[in-house]
């Protein structure tokens, strides 16, 4: 059975501000079969890449990455916001519309040479995922791919990660 994943995405007009269409993954997660199918597709991609560790940025990267790691029997490392990780970390910053944000990863999360898949729910401008990739590479990990439920292609996030293989379940154009 083939699933049209877009059937499980709620498109919310003018959220969080006028002119934006918010792509809500909650209905996908609420449907066990659709969520499992999405996880299975990303896991198959990861397995083909020989992935040894999954890294996902806070917070929805956890929703995507953890079940994939579980399915493959490999580890998951969270890239978190400031003050959320208790042991020594590395950090990488990225630009926001107004300002800057920083992600952190435990220094021992990735072993040098480890094959890593970076997962998130959505690729928009690419800043978050590019920072997550930098964290992995600071620790000597090899990013063998990136995976997303959704790509917002008009925002050109793909350009920021053009040197990395990318897998996405669905793509949207428009705000």
From Swiss-Prot:
Catalytic reactions on record: AMP + diphosphate = 5-phospho-alpha-D-ribose 1-diphosphate + adenine
Residue ranges that the Swiss-Prot or TrEMBL entry lists as coiled coil: none
Molecular function GO terms recorded: adenine binding; adenine phosphoribosyltransferase activity; AMP binding
UniProt key word Transcription regulation: no
Entry keywords, A to Z: Cytoplasm, Glycosyltransferase, Purine salvage, Transferase
Transmembrane segment boundaries: none
Record-stated family: Belongs to the purine/pyrimidine phosphoribosyltransferase family.
Task of the protein: Catalyzes a salvage reaction resulting in the formation of AMP, that is energically less costly than de novo synthesis.
Protein name stated in the entry: Adenine phosphoribosyltransferase
Species name: Lacticaseibacillus paracasei (strain ATCC 334 / BCRC 17002 / CCUG 31169 / CIP 107868 / KCTC 3260 / NRRL B-441) (Lactobacillus paracasei)
